[in-house]
UniProtKB/Swiss-Prot annotation:
Domain-type repeats, residues: 3-33, 40-71
Protein keywords: Disulfide bond, Ion channel impairing toxin, Proton-gated sodium channel impairing toxin, Repeat, Secreted, Toxin
Protein known as: Pi-hexatoxin-Hi1b
Source species: Hadronyche infensa (Fraser island funnel-web spider)
Disulfide topology: C3-C18, C10-C23, C17-C33, C40-C55, C47-C60, C54-C71
GO cellular component, one term: extracellular region
Cell location: Secreted
Length: 75
């Protein structure tokens, strides 16, 4: 089962949000995966669709071929 990405519904799947996200019930709306405050993706963690979630000093690096993007040191 793939993890649920940021801002997508996590109704009935509260524990399936991707790393650094938590299921949050929005007022007048359904539950969605939202970023945990202060959380960031460390070096070499996958950052597809989460380009701004890499820790300070890292940037989301698109690897060649069909590989997923990862947080890598800013060169």
């Amino acid at each position: 089962n793939e993890c649920i990405r940021k801002w997508l519904s996590c109704v009935d799947r509260k524990n399936d949000c991707c790393e650094g996200l938590e299921c949050y019930k929005r007022r007048h709306s359904f539950e969605v995966c939202v970023p945990i405050p202060g959380f960031c993706l460390v070096k070499w963690k996958q950052c597809d669709g989460r380009e701004r979630d890499c820790c300070p000093g890292l940037e989301c690096w698109k690897r060649s071929g069909n590989k997923s993007s990862v947080c890598a040191p800013i060169t």
